[in-house]
């Protein structure tokens, strides 16, 4: 269960779109909610032709950020969680946030995929991406809208889609996903995307084209059946464990060459309002996130995505 939720803010309207989901989770879990804004002290340059930034200017910027945090807390009104605080952190953004997470024993970070930047800069390489690479706690990433967020809204995730690839690494998302879902009486769909079988061509001497085609189809059907049985056994075993905790779980097997496309299609088909997955599965920890299945899902869906980078 979540006990401490942190929301990094950057002073932009985009960054605030993480707040409704964060407060909804914090209220239901009785967790502490921390709003964090990082102040990066401006460097002072000396030398001919250099612009010298006075301490007064830096202090003024710090006060503006502190005032912003206070205004955000006031905007919650009656919807404000019982344990909410705001913190102005100092230093580099990623380092300051990571240090605060370690200090406060934060177990969930909620943030938008991007904040400031021209044309809504892609999240890869942003603070969210860098945090995901450094932290082993889950990050709930929310895509920002074009209008100001309603801080008094109460989003609920009623249906969580959990893609799994059969690896132990991928299964680690089950704990944070179900911890979140239990707060909201969610139902879950465990999805296994299986690549279609591509059997080797049969020995062709003496076979007609029709016989060869029939042989290939028979091999495909046999392999597909074996793959389906394996996936069914795997998902059924996981589902039974979750149902033992009184969770509402269904399973789904899809044959598709491209896993991300299948996940996005299934999210729409089953009416999911949250996708939860590990950043790495069978590819292992050395695999770059760029171009991975989780990366493509995050870019391709407007749904919130709960991601976790597995620790070794």
Regions found by a protein language model. Name each.
Residues 18-20, 44-53, 89, 95, ...:
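A cross-kingdom feature marking solvent-exposed beta-strand/loop segments within repeated
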Residues 21, 60-72, 96, 176, ...:
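Short, solvent-exposed amphipathic alpha-helices that sit
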Residues 18, 65-68, 127, 173, ...:
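Hydrophobic alpha-helical membrane-association signature
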Residues 53-67, 213-233:
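A short acidic, glycine-rich active-site loop
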Residues 1-53, 85, 155-218, 239-252, ...:
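Small/aliphatic-rich secondary-structure junction motif
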Residues 1, 24-28, 98-150, 264-312:
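Gly/Ser-rich helix-loop-strand patches that form or flank binding pockets
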Residues 28-107:
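Ordered, small/hydrophobic-rich secondary-structure cores
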Residues 1, 14, 74-109, 148, ...:
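Structural beta-alpha unit
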């Amino acid at each position: 269960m979540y006990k401490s939720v942190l929301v990094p803010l950057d002073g932009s309207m985009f960054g605030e779109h993480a707040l409704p989901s964060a407060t909804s989770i914090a209220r239901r879990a009785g967790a502490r909610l921390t709003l964090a804004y990082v102040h990066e002290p401006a460097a002072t340059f000396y030398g001919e032709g250099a612009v010298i930034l006075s301490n007064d200017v830096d202090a003024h910027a710090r006060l503006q950020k502190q005032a912003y945090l206070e205004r955000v807390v006031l905007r919650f009104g009656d919807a404000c969680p019982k344990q909410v605080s705001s913190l102005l952190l100092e230093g580099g953004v990623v380092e300051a946030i990571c240090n605060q997470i370690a200090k406060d024993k934060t177990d969930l970070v909620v943030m938008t995929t991007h904040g400031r930047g021209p044309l809504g800069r892609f999240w890869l390489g942003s603070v969210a991406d860098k945090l995901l690479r450094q932290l082993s706690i889950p990050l709930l990433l929310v895509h920002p809208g074009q209008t100001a967020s309603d801080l008094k809204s109460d989003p609920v995730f009623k249906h969580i889609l959990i893609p799994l690839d059969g690896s132990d690494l991928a299964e680690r998302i089950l704990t944070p996903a179900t911890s979140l879902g239990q707060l909201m009486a969610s139902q879950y769909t465990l999805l296994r995307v299986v690549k279609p079988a591509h059997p080797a061509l049969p020995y062709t001497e003496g076979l007609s084209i029709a016989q060869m085609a029939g042989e290939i189809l028979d091999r495909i059907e046999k392999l597909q059946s074996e793959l389906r049985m394996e996936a069914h056994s795997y998902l059924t075993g996981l589902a039974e464990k979750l149902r033992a905790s009184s969770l509402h779980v269904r399973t789904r097997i899809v044959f598709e060459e491209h896993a991300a496309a299948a996940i996005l299609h299934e999210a729409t088909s089953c009416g999911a309002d949250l996708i939860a997955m590990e950043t790495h599965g069978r590819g292992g920890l050395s695999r770059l996130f760029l171009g991975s299945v989780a990366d493509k899902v995050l870019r391709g869906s407007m749904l919130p995505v709960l991601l976790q980078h597995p620790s070794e």
